[in-house]
């Protein structure tokens, strides 16, 4: 199980969640038991699987519409109360008192995951190397494929190139982006960004982001700007480098309740869109 930055927000109290709890939603491992009533034939004891940080019910209005990222029961039961769909947690202390689960509570030795939230992984891939698939990789893919609806030949910028941002670079390049610009404050991350698909890099500490991106794009700005940190400053950067008709796709979760300013007239007159993706 990996440790996501949102886990750190919960640990620090910036994201409210019941306590005591077990965190961890970047999971992969081996099935040791199948619950009663399991109907799917794709899963078997001894099989390696990767889990998804979202655990959609598969039955609500959002799930039926293909928007499992908006699953109402998941957010009402798990994210607010720390329980699974039967209203119960699977974790307790030695005295039998409940310990709440953030997603599946993957940092425990064993975890219970709904069948809708796991997928088999090939035998030649180890669980250690595939734990990231259900969070950083899935979040990045959803942002590029569904959030931005990236089209071949478009220009892309990624503001903040950590775990999710780096995966966005890779997916954007694979899906046909003509330019992929990485923006960060860390030169080491920007060097790594080149290996993930970035065609250009900008250090936000030493370079004016808008001027640099406008020069790289012949004065137009980027068609899609992804914001992967969840801070007002990076929101402003992403909006500031956006082309007319462009889409800004924020992915990063902020620490607690934060707000970013949006220039109303520019957004309206230039037909720019802000499309959240989770």
Feature names for model-found ranges:
Residues 12-64, 68-69, 77-79, 122-124:
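Glycine-rich beta-strand-centered segment in the early N-terminal region that forms part
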């Amino acid at each position: 199980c990996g440790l996501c930055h949102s886990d750190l927000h919960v640990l620090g109290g910036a994201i409210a969640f019941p306590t005591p709890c077990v965190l961890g939603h970047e999971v992969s491992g081996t099935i040791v038991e199948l619950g009663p009533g399991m109907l799917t034939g794709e899963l078997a004891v001894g099989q390696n699987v990767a889990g998804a940080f979202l655990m959609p019910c598969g039955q609500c209005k959002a799930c039926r519409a293909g928007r499992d990222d908006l699953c109402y029961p998941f957010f009402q039961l798990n994210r607010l109360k720390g329980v699974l769909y039967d209203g119960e947690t699977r974790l307790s202390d030695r005295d039998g008192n409940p310990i709440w689960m953030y997603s599946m509570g993957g940092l425990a030795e064993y975890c219970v995951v709904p069948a809708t939230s796991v997928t088999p992984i090939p035998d030649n891939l180890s669980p250690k190397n595939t734990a990231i698939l259900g969070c950083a990789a899935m979040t990045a893919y959803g942002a590029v494929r569904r959030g931005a609806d990236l089209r071949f030949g478009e220009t892309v910028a990624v503001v903040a190139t950590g775990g999710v941002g780096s995966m966005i670079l890779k997916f954007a390049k694979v899906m046909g982006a003509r330019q992929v610009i990485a923006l960060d404050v860390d030169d080491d991350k920007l060097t790594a960004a080149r290996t993930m698909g970035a065609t250009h890099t900008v250090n936000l500490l030493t370079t004016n982001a808008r001027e640099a991106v406008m020069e790289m794009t012949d004065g137009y700005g980027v068609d899609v700007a992804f914001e992967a940190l969840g801070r007002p400053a990076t929101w402003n950067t992403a909006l500031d480098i956006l082309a007319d008709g462009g889409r800004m796709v924020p992915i990063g979760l902020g620490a607690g309740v934060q707000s970013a300013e949006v220039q109303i007239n520019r957004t309206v007159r230039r037909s720019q869109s802000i499309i959240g993706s989770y």
